[in-house]
């Protein structure tokens, strides 16, 4: 391959990403993906080219811009990003609370972006648990812990005794065996969150979604909750997705997904899990690009940039500044099998 890399690089007016086309490399990648397709387990969640646009009479806001995302059973994932990046919108779509404007989402074999409202309600009720940031959104203050956890079971065919037993078992799992008859007003913020988690898992869902679960507690309580997330994930096998601003969660999850401008821009994968995936499949999941360095997370996670279906990769402002890139023109070459991006002045 020539040292001069003939590429098609354009500026994206929406997210200022570079489009890099390398036909020979793409052919090899597609062949590898095809060879490994049979080896890969079907994901629990598959998001394809998700777009979400919010409209008012005078303005349109694009919250998601062609986002692709897969989640496999048993994963523990944190989704991080700045306010307005699209992470909460993604969580709402994953939970069936909103539908995408374009694209589709598969959950456990069902295309939940297309099914009826009745079918969607059944999936939300039986397969998905939710924990919100505000305890007032999770709990009824005039009910005891057991009564709060029983609430999701009220429309089941279980007897009162069976519901109470299941609620107590869920509270045991989150470490609140001594708080069965306590009211939320007598509990700490961390204890209230544990009750909310117990209510979310009492029906043994396949997926647990949490929106800023550590956002309203102190660091010690946050650390304890993070240990609980890991414990539940390991002991029950439940898939957990957490939207958060709390960067400390990175060391306690399998995968950290960074969302920027409505797209996934990078991922950090726990090294142990990354090596396992690589050994089993011979390649990583679709969309993972090259390695980048991160001194804070170097000992625990591998970090990757995300190459989307159009061949685009987003360079963060920090990367551009470090490389001396201060315009929308860059030089791209292939050197020893590596794509090198330089500023136009070099």
What residue spans do the PLM features occupy?
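Catalytic Walker B motif of ABC-type/P-loop ATPase nucleotide-binding domains
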Residues: 208-211
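Conserved ABC ATPase signature
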Residues: 183-187, 191
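A short, proline-enriched helix->beta-strand linker immediately N-terminal to the Walker B motif
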Residues: 202-206
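ABC ATPase NBD coupling module
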Residues: 59, 112-129
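Conserved ABC transporter NBD signature motif
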Residues: 103-111
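Helix-to-loop junction immediately C-terminal to a conserved catalytic motif
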Residues: 95
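Short coil-to-helix segment of the ABC ATPase nucleotide-binding domain corresponding to the Q-loop/switch region
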Residues: 142-150
């Amino acid at each position: 391959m020539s040292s001069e890399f003939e590429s098609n690089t354009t500026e994206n007016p929406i997210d200022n990403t570079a489009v890099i086309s390398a036909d020979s490399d793409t052919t090899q990648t597609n062949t590898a993906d095809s060879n490994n397709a049979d080896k890969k387990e079907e994901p629990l969640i598959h998001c394809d080219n998700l777009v979400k646009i919010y409209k008012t009479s005078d303005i349109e806001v694009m919250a998601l811009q062609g986002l692709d995302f897969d989640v496999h059973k048993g994963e523990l994932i944190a989704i991080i990003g700045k306010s307005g990046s699209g992470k909460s919108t993604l969580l709402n779509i994953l939970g069936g609370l909103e539908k995408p404007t374009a694209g589709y989402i598969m959950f456990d074999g069902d295309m939940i972006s297309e099914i009826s409202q009745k079918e969607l309600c059944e999936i939300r009720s039986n397969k998905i648990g939710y924990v919100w940031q505000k305890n007032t959104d999770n709990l009824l203050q005039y009910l005891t812990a057991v009564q709060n956890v029983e609430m999701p079971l009220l429309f089941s065919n279980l007897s009162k005794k069976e519901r109470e037993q299941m609620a107590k078992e869920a509270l045991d799992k989150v470490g609140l065996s001594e708080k069965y008859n306590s009211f939320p007003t007598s509990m700490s913020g961390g204890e209230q969150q544990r009750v909310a988690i117990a209510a979310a898992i009492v029906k043994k869902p396949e997926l647990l979604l949490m929106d800023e679960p550590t956002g309203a507690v102190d660091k010690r309580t946050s650390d304890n909750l993070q240990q609980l997330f890991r414990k539940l994930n390991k002991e029950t096998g439940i898939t957990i997705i957490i939207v958060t601003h709390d960067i400390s969660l990175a060391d306690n999850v399998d995968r950290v997904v960074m969302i920027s401008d409505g797209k996934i821009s990078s991922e950090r994968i726990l090294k142990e899990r990354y090596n396992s995936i690589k050994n089993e499949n011979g390649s990583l999941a679709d969309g993972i690009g090259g390695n980048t360095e991160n001194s804070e997370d170097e000992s625990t996670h591998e970090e990757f940039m995300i190459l989307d279906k159009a061949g685009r990769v987003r360079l963060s402002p920090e990367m551009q500044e470090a490389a001396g890139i201060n315009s929308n023109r860059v030089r791209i070459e292939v050197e020893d099998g590596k794509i090198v991006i330089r500023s136009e002045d070099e």
